[in-house]
Regions:
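Active-site/acyl-donor-binding loops of N-acyltransferases
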Residues: 2, 113-116, 120-139
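Conserved donor-binding loop and adjoining core beta-sheet/short helix segment
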Residues: 51-89
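Short amphipathic alpha-helix that is part of the acyltransferase structural core
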Residues: 1-42
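Generic structural motif
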Residues: 18, 71-73, 86, 135-139
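Active-site rim helix/loop that mediates acceptor-substrate recognition in acyltransferases
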Residues: 35-56
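Charged/polar, solvent-exposed surface patches and flexible loops
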Residues: 22, 26-29, 33, 46-50, ...
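Intrinsically disordered, low-complexity boundary segments flanking structured domains
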Residues: 1, 46, 67-71
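Acyl-donor binding region in acyl/amide transferases
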Residues: 76-124
Length: 139
């Protein structure tokens, strides 16, 4: 599995390189809130670096923020909604425009890594797997 380079067409780049940091900072709370549910896989600095380098895309909204990444699997390319924080209604509505953007990038599907509640909100998504984690640091 590799991450597709979307630096030439990502929403982050459309902000302009000088605006990425400012927009990220404006949305830091939404991103930090979403990271609380990520199992400690990334720091907020990791997310900023991924957005700044084009590995992930920053989708700033009025009352929310979504972070996506385009992932090439061997048989298809997906746009993964990696982090989402803020107003639930706005996030659900924004998914539609992100899906349009993803299709324009050659994505075959959308994918969401998130809490179980997203399944109730996004009726056109199908649960295809369950992610289980076990913390080995204290064993």
């Amino acid at each position: 599995m590799t991450t597709k380079d979307t630096t030439q067409t990502s929403p982050t780049l459309l902000l302009g390189k000088d605006r990425i940091k400012a927009k990220f900072e404006e949305n830091r709370k939404f991103i930090a809130d979403a990271l609380e549910y990520s199992g400690g896989t990334h720091s907020i600095e990791d997310v900023y670096l991924a957005c700044a380098t084009g590995e992930a895309q920053l989708h700033p909204l009025e009352k929310s923020c979504i972070i996506t990444e385009v992932v090439d699997y061997p048989s298809l390319t997906v746009c993964r909604i990696w982090l989402a924080g803020g107003d639930l209604d706005e996030l659900v509505e924004a998914e539609k425009s992100i899906a349009v953007w993803a299709k324009s990038q050659g994505c075959d599907a959308m994918e969401i890594n998130g809490r179980k509640g997203w399944q109730r909100q996004l009726k056109d998504y199908t649960a295809t797997s369950v992610v289980l984690t076990k913390d080995l640091r204290n064993e």
